[in-house]
Regions:
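Transmembrane signal-anchor hairpin modules in multi-pass inner-membrane enzymes, especially those
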Residues: 1-91, 111, 121-127, 131, ...
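Alpha-helical transmembrane segments of multi-pass inner-membrane proteins
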Residues: 2, 22-24, 44-47, 121-153, ...
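Transmembrane alpha-helices of multi-pass inner-membrane enzymes
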Residues: 42-48, 223, 359-362, 385-434
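Perimembrane helix-loop-helix junctions
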Residues: 53, 112, 220-244
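Aromatic-anchored transmembrane helix interface
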Residues: 76-87, 96-121, 127-137, 141, ...
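A membrane-periplasm/extracellular boundary helix in multi-pass inner-membrane enzymes
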Residues: 205, 209, 230-281, 295-303, ...
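Long extracytoplasmic/lumenal interhelical loops at the membrane interface
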Residues: 281-295, 303, 307-348
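Hydrophobic transmembrane alpha-helices and their immediate junctions
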Residues: 324, 348-390
Length: 434
């Protein structure tokens, strides 16, 4: 990649900004909603690459791309790690002779490369992203209310594979809205503050309606990141005001709405299930079955540490463990290990786990380096970016969230968009927006 990316035509900035906004607008509110925005970003990224190769005369390019920050070691490292995750996943699938369907999620890490590179060469319209994010959460909350109040579902699941990723992604997007509202409040942009705070409330409602217990694990992490980025005297009053409104609204939902009572019962049941497993060996409940699946995987991983087990091979091996009485039979009914890290370690070995952890850690660290930047926009975008890998690490403790198309698309698109937006804001802060 060139150190100083060439400018791209103005229409590509519009196209990529629209693709990013549509990704957040449709991610949880439309069937396969991730495909529309993600497809636009991929096509736009390829078009930017092509125009960069074909353009020989700088005056033909629009100046909208001139303010993009130069490529650094950080950019190249993120691209290399995305490529490494793809390569090791492909190697493991081919080595084990697994079905081609297990290449699906891995290929998306490869396709994220032109998206990331393209976004780094245009000017993202942050106001479009904010509107897409807020409107996406409004429709998500509406769908959650419709499913729980009129369709009769016990847990809102939107149009994704289950209630768990629905709640997790709603929480993440809601946190981003809250951070955006805090930034807008410090700039006295009250209309934007109201819009984004309402989006955060909508995301919180959708998370509660999903009754996702794994989401709670991420909350302390998000709170710490927000505190590091925003706890300055000038930000304290709007931040505390927004948090107070959010906490009050959450308490009202939990105390008065049926979906709140159901969520509370789910959280309390987790402790009962833990006691049933630890004291009575009951592996038939949600908590016990997950722990038994982890036990089976951790028994098996040392036998094939480098590239792990093929899916068909492991299913046969698991039945052998059950027959030998080492694992409870109920573990054999689960579709996966319900842990992102163990799942990768089991089926891609230590190589796959190292590549995946490296991507999470590098992304987290690169964003965290800007949490105390002088410019508030850079700090807020850094906080939102750092929240992505850390929240997904927390979500991955109890589910294979990146084993689903919606989960991996949300993660990769958000990583590319937030990284490009933060680097753009960083450049603007250095040059005065020139």
């Amino acid at each position: 990649m060139p150190n100083h990316p060439a400018a791209s035509p103005a229409w590509l900035s519009t196209w990529m900004s629209a693709g990013a906004a549509l990704s957040f607008l449709l991610m949880l509110s439309a069937p396969s909603g991730y495909s529309v925005g993600g497809g636009m970003l991929l096509l736009g990224g390829l078009a930017i690459w092509w125009t960069g190769r074909c353009t020989r005369h700088p005056h033909r390019a629009d100046t909208s791309g001139q303010a993009s920050a130069p490529w650094t070691v950080e950019d190249r490292t993120l691209c290399a790690l995305l490529l490494a995750v793809f390569a090791i996943n492909t190697l493991a699938v081919l080595w084990h002779g697994d079905s081609g369907k297990y290449l699906d999620q891995g290929v998306r890490y490869l396709l994220a490369l032109p998206v990331l590179a393209g976004l780094r060469r245009i000017r993202l319209r942050l106001d479009w992203l904010a509107v897409g994010l807020a409107l996406g959460l409004f429709t998500t909350a509406g769908i959650a209310a419709w499913q729980t109040r009129w369709v009769g579902l016990a847990r809102a699941e939107g149009f994704v594979t289950s209630a768990i990723p629905f709640g997790d992604m709603a929480l993440t997007m809601g946190f981003w809205c809250l951070m955006g509202a805090a930034l807008a409040a410090t700039q006295r942009r009250w209309a934007w503050t109201a819009l984004l705070l309402a989006g955060s409330l909508a995301g919180t409602y959708a998370m509660i309606a999903s009754a996702s217990r794994g989401s709670l694990v991420a909350l302390p992490i998000l709170a710490i990141l927000a505190a590091i980025a925003l706890l300055r005297r000038v930000h304290l009053r709007p931040l505390l005001g927004g948090v107070a409104i959010l906490v009050a609204a959450t308490a009202i939902v939990l105390a008065t709405l049926p979906v709140g009572h159901f969520a509370e019962s789910r959280y309390a049941a987790a402790l009962d299930e833990w006691h049933a497993y630890s004291q009575q060996g009951d592996a038939t409940n949600n908590v016990g079955s997950r722990l038994e699946a982890w036990k089976a995987a951790l028994i098996s991983i040392p036998e094939r540490p480098l590239l792990g087990w093929g899916h068909a091979q492991y299913n046969t091996h698991l039945q052998d463990l059950i027959s030998a009485g080492r694992i409870a039979p109920f573990a054999g009914t689960l579709s996966n290990t319900h842990n992102q890290f163990i799942e990768i370690w089991l089926h891609q070995g230590s190589l796959g786990l190292i590549a995946f952890l490296s991507l999470l850690i590098a992304g987290f660290w690169y964003f965290c380096r800007r949490l105390r930047a002088p410019d508030p926009t850079v700090r807020v975008l850094a906080c939102c970016g750092a929240a992505l890998p850390s929240a997904f690490a927390a979500f991955g403790l109890t589910q294979v969230i990146l084993g689903r198309n919606n989960g991996v698309m949300f993660f990769l698109v958000s990583l590319a968009v937030l990284w490009a937006a933060m680097r753009q804001a960083e450049r603007d802060a250095e040059t005065g927006g020139a």
